[in-house]
């Protein structure tokens, strides 16, 4: 439940996360944040650590309070993915992550104060990781 909706969609509060999972239960690659209020709306999202291993945005504690008690076991941080016809232009938005408490089923999209880009290009990073993994 996103009490305040998400940026650009303030009336979409109910979402489900659709993911293809690895053996450890973590999402692999791109997942979908599917609106239950507006069935035609689904947003591609991914774990930012897949493309920026040092991604640690500073988030004010009061922004996280509505989500309940967060810990490494129940927190998901996801970023939106933007794809164009040219797949090499694939990018993620590191400026406005989604913070989700999986146990409480509550989420919030936050604009972080850190100097992260709205368009962080990821195609080459993902391609290199696939090649490393032999895929």
Regions found by a protein language model. Give the residues of each.
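Extended catalytic/binding region for NAD+/ADP-ribose chemistry, centered on the ART fold
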Residues: 54-59
């Amino acid at each position: 439940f996103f009490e305040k909706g998400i940026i650009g969609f303030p009336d979409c509060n109910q979402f489900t996360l659709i993911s293809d999972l690895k053996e450890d239960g973590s999402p692999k690659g791109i997942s979908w944040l599917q609106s239950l209020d507006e069935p035609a709306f689904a947003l591609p999202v991914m774990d930012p650590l897949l493309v920026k291993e040092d991604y640690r945005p500073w988030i004010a504690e009061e922004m996280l309070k509505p989500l309940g008690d967060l810990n490494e076991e129940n927190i998901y941080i996801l970023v939106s993915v933007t794809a164009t016809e040219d797949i090499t232009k694939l990018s993620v938005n590191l400026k406005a992550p989604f913070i989700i408490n999986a146990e409480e089923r509550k989420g919030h999209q936050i604009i972080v104060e850190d100097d992260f880009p709205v368009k962080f290009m990821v195609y080459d990073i993902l391609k290199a990781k696939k090649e490393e993994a032999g895929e």
